[in-house]
Regions:
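Nuclease-adjacent, charged terminal/linker segments that flank catalytic cores
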Residues: 1-111
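Non-catalytic C-terminal interaction segments of nucleic acid-processing enzymes
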Residues: 12, 188, 195-277
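Active-site metal-binding core of divalent-cation-utilizing nuclease and nuclease-like domains
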Residues: 100-128
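Short, solvent-exposed loop/turn segments at secondary-structure junctions
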Residues: 109-114, 138-142, 202, 217-221
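A short, conserved, highly charged catalytic patch centered on acidic carboxylates
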Residues: 123, 138-149
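Active-site beta-strand-loop-beta-strand hairpin of nuclease catalytic cores
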Residues: 124-134, 203-208
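Active-site cores of enzymes that catalyze phosphoryl transfer or operate on phosphate-rich substrates
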Residues: 132, 154-173, 262-277
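Acidic, metal/cofactor-coordinating or nucleic-acid-engaging core segments within structured domains
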Residues: 144-212
Length: 277
């Protein structure tokens, strides 16, 4: 059994233990059944503004947030709890110094002036210093190898020969973009093009410092070695420019649990759902 299948089986076992009945694809009947608590008003509005695919069933598939393997559901279960609470314990667990200027955002939107919708960050924080912290969440996605033939960047990112990343103070990122497009550099497990788009959004929308977090659910397996090596290579190339912070959900949960400043029901839910062996 592959590591991804083992992870999906773990989620299915959790659902059954809660009296839930996932379908053959791992989707629950209702979004609420997949969450620690109902979506906050702010998170609900953010998902609705994003087109509704996370919340509404489609002809081809149920709403994405119904999936036991949903990365968005994982992020919501970790972060939406803090949207109306003192976030000091969360910031401490993330290694962030300072306090929030505004409530954290689920599905943070960072327009960059191009046509179409920019990719949403799973979580967006703005500190009192005006620094922006973007968090990209991954659950099972990184366990699937990326297709070499896929289009990494749409033509709009290069119209008129403008170097968007360099113009936004990210010359190392611009160099990496060029190497990706030419095929000089290839990443098999890490979705580097998505991270570079998020970095551009943060740079365009922040007049002060910003940082990009890559928060992922680690699974010991051969793919993890490749993934971690690609994280190292990416960090070596552009990490300083982005203040890039890779962090596992396992480590974040460990830090939150050790702080003794989070609600017991919240921690118990996360432990039984994601971290019980």
């Amino acid at each position: 059994m592959t590591s991804k299948r083992a992870l999906l089986r773990m989620q299915r076992s959790w659902a059954v233990s809660q009296g839930l009945t996932p379908d053959t694809r791992g989707y629950l009947a209702e979004v609420a059944a997949n969450l620690f608590r109902p979506l906050s008003a702010r998170a609900l509005a953010a998902f609705e503004e994003g087109g509704g695919a996370e919340l509404k069933d489609r002809p081809s598939a149920p709403a994405k947030l119904k999936a036991l393997h949903s990365s968005a559901a994982l992020a919501v279960n970790f972060f939406d709890y803090w949207i109306d609470r003192d976030c000091a314990p969360l910031l401490e667990a993330l290694g962030i110094h300072g306090s929030l200027r505004a409530p954290l955002e689920i599905e943070g939107k960072l327009p960059i002036g191009l046509t179409g919708n920019p990719p949403n960050l799973d979580v967006l924080l703005e500190l009192n210093s005006r620094a922006l912290i973007g968090i990209e969440s991954k659950f099972t996605e990184w366990l699937s190898r990326k297709r070499p033939s896929r289009v990494l960047f749409k033509p709009k990112y290069f119209e008129g020969g403008v170097e968007l990343w360099s113009r936004s103070g990210l010359p190392r990122c611009q160099s990496l973009v060029a190497d990706l497009v030419s095929g000089k550099e290839i990443y098999r497990m890490l979705d580097v093009s998505q991270l570079l788009k998020h970095a551009l959004g943060l740079a365009v929308n922040s007049r002060h410092a910003f940082s990009l977090y890559y928060l992922y659910f680690d699974v010991p397996c051969p793919a993890s070695k490749t993934h971690n090596e690609e994280l190292r290579v990416f960090g070596d190339r552009v990490g300083d420019e982005l203040r890039f912070v890779p962090l596992t959900y396992q480590e974040l949960f460990r830090r939150l649990s050790a702080s003794n400043r989070a609600d017991g029901d919240y921690l118990s839910y996360l432990e039984s759902r994601y971290f019980s062996s």
